[in-house]
Amino acid sequence: MVKKTIFAICTLFLLNIVAPTLETKALTFDKLPTKQTSKQWSVQVDKADQGKGLVKPEKGKFHTYSLEVDNIGKDVLSAEVHMFRNEPNSTTKFSLFSCPDEKECNKEHFERAISLADKLNDGYPYRFSNFLLAEKATEFEVEIIWTQKGMEGRPLKETFTFTAE
């Protein structure tokens, strides 16, 4: 009888310690806009643009947001912006968008990177006005890969991670 009581108490104790750590939180931005910056980049997540033809949030499935990336540092020769979300219980990150027009990702890749860099250097931000983020995601990652003018052969990368609090 004493062994059963001790076992029951130990089990309850362990459940109180382990159960809260298994709780997952969905990534929601309580306060928008939210911004992260570095010496080179400013990354801001805000409310999604609304309008005809734009996707709307769907309760229980996904939220919608907008993203704005500004070059606040030195001029760049080429730039790429990638967005990822996580999947609970997985180390794999999932891209939030595919290649333009379902084309091969590497085709015209360099030309797009140079075109984006030119716009960023001219003070125009990269703006993604309406993107989906699954409710089950607990992490949103923006990865920027660029080459600096004068250092063309060496790509640089920064990652901005927004997590559930």
Where are the model-predicted features located?
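Short, cysteine-centered beta-strand-loop-beta hairpins and adjacent loop/turn segments enriched
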Residues: 74, 148-154
